């Protein structure tokens, strides 16, 4: 959430940041709300000071021997009660305006960091580096073709069970999915991450705190009879793991890794990636998440990105790192690196991880703080990154490992988990 103080003191900075995202927002109504709140606060403080003064005066007169039921005392108490009523009215007005202000601020995205890569859309993103040698060839198949030949999954029966964009994995694919999850968790735990297994259902406050609500309500699955939603990513419950807390500075950074099923409605993606594992309503993902001090969050983004890259390197999958421009940033992010894995069957790079520094955006929405060196409460910075999306990783393994005899060579790092170095036709 954008800092209200910034809205009052430097609205031009907000306007410029939003414009760099391609948004032209009239901040006038928001500034009016801030001005009204400031005036009401001053008025309330003045009235409360008067009320306190009257209370002291009543106490002094009673000490001097004036009877409790004297006319003078009664008049003072009447005046004091009138002030209390006025204060109550002002507080209700403040609450109403504050709610309206928050409703609008919650719909504004994070501001890009200073000196960001300017751009309108993904065409303006910048490739930073590559790893591995992409293979190519006219006879290479896409992962869904390979899966059908090896009988790895069934999407048709899954649409009977649920609807389209669901898949049921069988035998080797189910085992490979499980192997990838355990491999990724173990790799990150060795790097010092603390494993957590969060709930797959989250409440509205959790989705609001991480930035999914209210903007993206249509993108998530909601339970009909409860204030619960299926989580779109483990980022949501991990953000709320410390909601409303003050985390001791000596515990920072907190680094979590979590496996979770993820659920997304994929509204607006009709007709795109209808086959295979690229765009499903339900998929598994291993998520990396940091709670960092503000001064270390830039370095933390480089580290979390490196940790996500290490998974691809261990799995021998070629990839590239892309810095997103301001117009392509996610809602909660102020800076993002995407990792795109090479899919030779499709002859393209596809996003497999997105690593973002959210600054204090989520921490402000979720009230997550620490103390600075002067013992003053300050907001933390949060960072997240996929480490990795399991289905897309499996797709990359199938396409990059395909052999002329129809078998699939598996990465050496998976052999201890899968128990074999190949997938073979049966």
From Swiss-Prot:
GO terms, molecular function: ATP binding; serine-tRNA ligase activity
Pfam family, one: tRNA-synt_2b
Cellular localization per UniProt: Cytoplasm
Annotated keywords: Aminoacyl-tRNA synthetase, ATP-binding, Cytoplasm, Ligase, Nucleotide-binding, Protein biosynthesis
Binding site for L-serine: 233-235, 287, 386
Main location class: cytoplasm
Pathway: Aminoacyl-tRNA biosynthesis; selenocysteinyl-tRNA(Sec) biosynthesis; L-seryl-tRNA(Sec) from L-serine and tRNA(Sec): step 1/1
GO biological process per UniProt: selenocysteine biosynthetic process; seryl-tRNA aminoacylation
Binding residue positions for ATP: 264-266, 351-354
Signal peptide limits: none
Enzyme class: ligase
Enzyme Commission number(s): 6.1.1.11
InterPro entries: aa-tRNA-synt_IIb (IPR002314), aa-tRNA-synth_II (IPR006195), aa-tRNA-synth_II/BPL/LPL (IPR045864), Ser-tRNA-ligase_type_1 (IPR002317), Ser-tRNA-synth_1_N (IPR015866), SerRS_1_N_sf (IPR042103), SerRS_core (IPR033729), tRNA-bd_arm (IPR010978)
Catalyzed reactions per annotation: tRNA(Ser) + L-serine + ATP = L-seryl-tRNA(Ser) + AMP + diphosphate + H(+); tRNA(Sec) + L-serine + ATP = L-seryl-tRNA(Sec) + AMP + diphosphate + H(+)
One GO term describing the cellular component: cytoplasm
Family: Belongs to the class-II aminoacyl-tRNA synthetase family. Type-1 seryl-tRNA synthetase subfamily.
The protein's role, per its UniProt record: Catalyzes the attachment of serine to tRNA(Ser). Is also able to aminoacylate tRNA(Sec) with serine, to form the misacylated tRNA L-seryl-tRNA(Sec), which will be further converted into selenocysteinyl-tRNA(Sec).
UniProt free text on domains: Consists of two distinct domains, a catalytic core and a N-terminal extension that is involved in tRNA binding.
Subunit relationships: Homodimer. The tRNA molecule binds across the dimer.
Protein name: Serine--tRNA ligase
């Amino acid at each position: 959430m954008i800092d209200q103080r910034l809205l009052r003191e430097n609205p031009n900075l907000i306007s410029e940041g939003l414009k760099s995202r391609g948004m032209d927002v009239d901040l006038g109504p928001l500034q009016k709300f801030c001005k009204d709140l400031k005036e009401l606060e001053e008025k309330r403080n003045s009235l409360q000071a008067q009320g306190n003064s009257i209370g002291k005066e009543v106490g002094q007169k009673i000490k001097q021997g004036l009877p409790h039921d004297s006319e003078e005392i009664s008049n003072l108490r009447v005046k004091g009660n009138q002030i209390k009523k006025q204060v109550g009215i002002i507080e209700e007005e403040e609450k109403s305006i504050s709610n309206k202000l928050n409703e609008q601020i919650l719909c504004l995205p994070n501001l890009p960091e200073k000196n960001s890569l300017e751009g309108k859309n993904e065409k303006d993103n910048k490739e930073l580096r590559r790893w591995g040698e992409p293979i190519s060839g006219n006879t290479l198949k896409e992962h869904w073709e390979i899966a059908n030949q090896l009988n790895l999954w069934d999407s048709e029966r899954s649409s009977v069970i649920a609807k389209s964009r669901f898949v049921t994995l069988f035998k080797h694919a189910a085992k490979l999915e499980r192997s990838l999850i355990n491999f990724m968790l173990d790799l990150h735990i060795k790097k010092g991450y603390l494993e957590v297994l969060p709930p797959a259902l989250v409440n509205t406050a959790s989705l609001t705190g991480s930035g999914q609500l209210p903007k993206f309500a249509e993108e998530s699955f909601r339970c009909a009879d409860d204030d619960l939603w299926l989580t779109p990513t483990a980022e949501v419950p991990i953000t709320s793991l410390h909601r409303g807390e003050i985390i001791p500075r000596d515990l920072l950074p907190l680094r979590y890794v979590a496996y979770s099923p993820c659920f997304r409605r994929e509204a607006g993606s009709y007709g795109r990636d209808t086959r295979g594992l690229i765009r499903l309503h339900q998929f598994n993902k291993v998520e990396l998440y940091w709670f960092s001090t503000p001064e270390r969050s830039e370095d933390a983004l480089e580290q979390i990105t490196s940790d996500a890259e290490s998974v691809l390197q261990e799995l021998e999958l070629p990839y590239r790192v892309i810095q997103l421009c301001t117009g392509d940033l996610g809602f909660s992010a102020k800076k993002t690196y995407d990792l795109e894995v090479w899919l030779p069957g499709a002859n393209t790079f596809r996003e497999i991880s997105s690593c973002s520094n959210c600054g204090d955006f989520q921490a402000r929405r979720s009230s997550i703080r620490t103390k600075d060196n002067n013992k003053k409460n300050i907001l933390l910075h949060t960072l997240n990154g996929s480490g990795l999306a399991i289905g897309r990783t499996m797709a990359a393994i199938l396409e990059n490992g395909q052999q002329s005899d129809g078998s699939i060579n598996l990465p050496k790092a998976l052999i201890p988990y899968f128990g074999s170095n190949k997938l073979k036709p049966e």
